[in-house]
Design a protein with these regions (language model features):
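Right-hand nucleic-acid polymerase module
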Residues: 1-72, 80-183
């Protein structure tokens, strides 16, 4: 939650919610994470080259992994700069198809984010019971996942948050947590 709020605070709010379903591969539990890393690398490279004439912001995203229904999938919240949304969403199935070998039906789903706090509570429902109450989340078992269940990009990590606060880029007040995200 802190990472997503920090994205909003540094004016790189998470704009799209993408769910990618990974094919089942017997005996290779880490394949979905490797495949997602390839998709994310393609997206990062594409954004870098599209924005080469301007200051380049790093890829800003948050992702959680779930496997409740037996199909491992990633919930990916990503910042897509205005003006590049159409091109990005057109390239997404191409990247997924290249990594998967073909694009199966139902491999991905994309939605715009209108209520960030609601989406965060949804994707973080796999949080451990001991921690969920702090965030107002009703925990639900989301299956076994190999690797980290929740990951934020390095530009939203703890060190980046501390650096941005130290540099005066972000000023946190007691009202910061209660601020509504812009529509």
């Amino acid at each position: 939650m802190r990472a997503a709020r920090h994205a909003w605070a540094i004016q790189r709010d998470l704009t799209h919610f993408i769910v990618i379903n990974f094919p089942v591969r017997d005996g290779d539990e880490l394949a979905p994470q490797r495949d997602f890393r390839k998709i994310r690398t393609k997206a990062r490279s594409w954004l870098y080259h599209r924005r080469s004439h301007r200051i380049v912001d790093p890829l800003t995203d948050v992702r959680t992994w779930e496997s409740a229904s037996g199909v491992e999938h990633v919930n990916w919240l990503i910042h897509i700069p205005h003006g590049l949304t159409g091109e990005f969403l057109a390239m997404l199935p191409v990247w997924i198809g290249k990594v998967f070998g073909s694009l199966p039906e139902g491999a991905y789903h994309v939605e715009e984010i209108y209520n960030l706090n609601g989406v965060l509570k949804y994707i973080l429902k796999g949080t451990q019971q001991g921690h969920a109450h702090r965030f107002g989340i009703n925990p639900v078992y989301q299956g076994e996942v190999w690797g980290r269940r929740a990951v934020a990009s390095t530009c939203l990590g703890k060190t980046a948050r501390e650096r941005d606060e130290f540099d005066g880029q972000v000023v946190r007040t007691s009202r910061f947590r209660k601020q509504k995200t812009p529509a």
